[in-house]
């Protein structure tokens, strides 16, 4: 007993306390907000000042061009700024979720998957000029699309929680009813702009994706209700409302594929199936490979890459117990059985294939500064694809050999969500727009 205690030299920080890293991330976000307000106010108080001019040049103009005339591309200033803010938000939000006691469930990340697809479909509809470039279209241009999605997610999560809490025994049924209402709300908001591009009588409209796709989403929301009992009310609401919203945006994509606008010529579905299918097969094989090791850790009450409660990472590295040996030996394989880790890897592979195929075979251009540099160095877009597959392997390596303290379980999930936002979301957008030739 004395030997074991000698290995535990530090007590983990309480969940209610913020670490230096978390306070530093909050400072970066606060600084960004102050600079943003200063740039906006500076237009009126001191026209022509360097802060306001830089804000217009590096942030506003690219966004305006992107929403009105097409891909404007990023620049080094906004690339660094967005990256720094993204990492800071990941750290701060994970700390906030830990402090208020939200359970760090893998299912929470899976519940956000429909919203990643929702954002990708919305961006493609914006690329196809279905939304007003000077109005709603701006909401589907990066980086504003991320805040747009966040508003939907936060509001739906809040409403789902409150509906369930106030409804008693039939709260879950009320959450499904809420999801139906939210689907209809999205239909009312987005359908007028999507549907105005095709002239149809009522019979043609009922037989077209403009009606059939949202109706299919409505049916699916109702049909999956019994299978969501294992989820929290927030997760259920996000899944159902997100799926419904995906079908609302899917109607625009389907119409552009069936009845193209502006002399576009959609391609066959083979590139789409190749880009989304090959990574899926790889991840399916990896998932099967990791199941036995993951089950062994679960039987012991352990989770891959998570240090047991009450131990710091520093103390864990000094351990030599049977628990330490089992976790360290099984984690590299068990990680492969984690759906959320595989989703992060899948997103990187899809993004790599979509970019490579789109640039090499269909004449698209790369808008990200770092990605274009990789392509220039490699001499081919397939070099970027190879790098993305390498990043997928690095994601496995990170979660196989890095160790997260028990209090940092939220951070682990937010890191995976961040990887989905910068990997799967743009990858899906690229392959969906490539299929439409937009």
Predicted regions mapped to residue ranges:
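Charge-biased, low-complexity intrinsically disordered regions
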Residues: 2-438
């Amino acid at each position: 007993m004395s030997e074991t205690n000698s290995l535990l030299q530090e007590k983990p920080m309480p969940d209610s306390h913020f670490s230096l890293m978390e306070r530093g991330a909050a400072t970066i976000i606060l600084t960004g907000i102050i600079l943003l307000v200063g740039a906006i106010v500076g237009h009126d108080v001191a026209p022509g000042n360097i802060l306001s001019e830089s804000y217009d040049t590096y942030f506003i103009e690219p966004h305006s061009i992107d929403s009105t005339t097409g891909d404007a591309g990023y620049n080094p200033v906004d690339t660094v700024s967005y990256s720094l803010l993204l990492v800071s938000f990941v750290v701060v939000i994970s700390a906030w979720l830990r402090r208020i006691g939200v359970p760090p469930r893998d299912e929470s990340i899976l519940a956000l998957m429909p919203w990643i697809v929702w954002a990708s479909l919305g961006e493609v509809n914006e690329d196809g000029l279905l939304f007003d470039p000077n109005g709603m279209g701006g909401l589907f241009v990066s980086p504003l699309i991320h805040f747009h999605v966040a508003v939907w997610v936060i509001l739906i999560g809040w409403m789902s929680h409150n509906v369930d809490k106030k409804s008693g025994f039939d709260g879950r049924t009320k959450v499904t009813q809420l999801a139906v209402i939210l689907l209809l709300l999205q239909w009312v908001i987005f359908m007028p702009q999507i549907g105005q591009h095709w002239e149809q009588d009522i019979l043609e409209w009922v037989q077209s994706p403009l009606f059939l796709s949202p109706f299919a989403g409505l049916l699916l929301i109702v049909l999956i209700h019994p299978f969501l009992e294992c989820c929290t009310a927030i997760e259920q609401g996000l899944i159902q409302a997100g799926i419904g919203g995906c079908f609302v945006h899917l109607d625009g994509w389907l119409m552009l594929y069936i009845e193209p606008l502006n002399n576009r010529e959609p391609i066959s579905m083979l590139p789409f199936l190749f880009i989304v299918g090959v990574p899926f097969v790889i991840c399916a094989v990896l998932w099967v490979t990791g199941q036995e090791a993951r089950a062994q850790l679960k039987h012991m009450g352990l989770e891959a890459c998570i240090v047991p409660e009450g131990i710091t990472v520093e103390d864990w590295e000094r351990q030599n117990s049977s628990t330490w040996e089992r976790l360290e030996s099984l984690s590299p394989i068990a990680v492969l059985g984690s759906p959320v880790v595989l989703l992060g890897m899948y997103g990187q592979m899809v993004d790599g294939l979509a970019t490579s195929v789109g640039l090499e075979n269909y004449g698209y251009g790369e808008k990200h500064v770092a990605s274009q540099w990789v392509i220039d160095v490699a001499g081919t877009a397939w070099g970027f694809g190879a790098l993305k597959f390498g990043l997928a392997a690095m994601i496995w390596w990170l979660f196989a050999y890095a160790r997260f303290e028990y209090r940092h379980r939220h951070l682990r999930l937010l890191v995976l969500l961040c990887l989905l936002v910068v990997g799967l979301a743009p990858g899906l957008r690229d392959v969906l727009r490539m299929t439409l030739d937009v």
